[in-house]
Amino acid sequence: MKLGSRHNQHSFAQIPSVHTTRSKFNRSFGTKDTFKFDDLTPIFIDEILPGDTINMNTKTFIRLATQVVPVMDRMMLDFYFFFVPCRLVWDNWEKFNGAQDNPSDSTDYLIPTITAPAGGFENMSIYDHFGIPTQVANLEINALPFRAYNLIYNDWFRDQNLIGKIAVPKGDGPDNHADYQLLKAAKPHDYFTSALPWPQKGMAVEMPIGNSAPITYVPNAGNGPYPHFNWVQTPGGPGNNGALSQVTFGGQKAISAAGNDPIGYDPQGTLIADLSSATAATINQLRQAMMMQSLLELDARGGTRYVEILKSHFNVISLDFRLQRPEYLSGGTIDLQQNPVPQTSSSTTDSPQGNLAAFSTASEFGNKIGFSKSFVEHGYVLGFIRARGQVTYQQGLHKMWSRQTRWDFFWPKFQELGEQAILNKEIYAQGNATDSEIFGYQERYGEYRFRPSEIKGQFRSNFAESLDVWHLAEYFTVKPSLNKTFIESNTPIERSLVVTRPDYPDLIGDFWFDYTHVRPMVTYGVPATFGRF
């Protein structure tokens, strides 16, 4: 009798494989939106199914509001695309899909929601940019994409040294609509924006000098002109000055010696620590302290998100999905191209022939901004745009002008010392004592490696008749501090635009997403016949 091999025998430990039909869909679409400089504005949102494969290229045409003049500065548009699994923004996502820790656990869950307030979601709000109808009161919507927005901001656009985490609810909801609003990304790093608020992450490591030292008495009180002790015989009466030998307690004198010698106390102290006999730190303890300080300095410079620790300490790049964080898919940057418009039909003296105005546009119709990606779990793909200008400063004094001693200059022997201070006058000179206070910390001799752009002459914003409409340099009305206000992108675009109303958009955009989607579903949703017809 011939027996079958164990490979073709039935196994109760297995289930049959699922052969899911996958179909290709052209889901290309367009969107038109208005937005402001510096805001991290959503332009794309789509839900993802396990087994999806997408290929997308972004085509865009963007126009800046009419300018007073053609600005002599670079203006850029950054695009970002991320994937956020549902399980990262809802703790009970797996249970919602049927998972149980115990056989009797409930799987009766509903997607967390947000309810619109009275008056509905506002125009130009984050809800508007996600495509939610505005001005509709009590509208109930899925909260997970908004949680994903906040999570992406925390992990990718927030300066962890200066800005605290924003709320990312992960419970069953409902969420408060006020928890979600348009956020601003941190400025690109330069000499000032990459400054640290401290020279190391955490407390500075102290030098080990041992545990104890003997105390020695120094008899230096002497017989100086110290005052006698005073005491009062009658409450509220005058004090009596006298020798301590005249004071009695129960008939006994306070001291037995006769005379009027006073008792004195030396305010300079009579005890010293004899460090010649102190216990000493070992060389290994000194090495350990130095290496610990070096590690904390690297933590400060490299960052302490786990992915940053792996890169800065081990030179290992861990994939985003392995660290349970939003996965960066793709991005790109395009420039706004400025077009001067000369006055050719002057009819007033304040707009002579040849007077310049300007308009700016940006376009991308190639494959520069896009990606291809296959997915293995439920989630959302989110796309963002951010408009920004090149950051320039105009009120600081370069460190070169403040060098006085030999040690203020570069020396090769000193280039591996710790972080050096950036003084306030380097970014905002005032000519007073605050100039020498610390703004932040930068790598040793960083000013030799970075050359800032400059603003001079009538371009300076403090000029009585300034021409600062021609550029986008920062101008501080008060001394800046290294904090959230400073680090968030804040391009002064309004001074270069004709219309400066806060409710008026800086840019208008037309976006076309060339979007091919392969999904685990049949091409057409034909009702099943169950083999009967």
From Swiss-Prot:
Location(s), subcellular: Virion; Host cytoplasm
Chain spans, region Disordered: 333-353
GO molecular function: structural molecule activity
Sequence similarity: Belongs to the microviridae F protein family.
Superkingdom of origin organism: Viruses
Keywords: Capsid protein, Host cytoplasm, T=1 icosahedral capsid protein, Virion
Organism from which the protein derives: Bdellovibrio phage phiMH2K (Bacteriophage phiMH2K)
Role: Assembles to form an icosahedral capsid with a T=1 symmetry.
Keyword Secreted in annotation: no
Alphabetical list of Pfam families matching this protein: Phage_F
InterPro entries tied to this protein: Capsid/spike_ssDNA_virus (IPR016184), Microviridae_protein_F (IPR003514), Microviridae_protein_F_sf (IPR037002)
Main location, first listed in the record: virion
UniProt protein name: Capsid protein VP1
GO CC annotation: host cell cytoplasm; T=1 icosahedral viral capsid
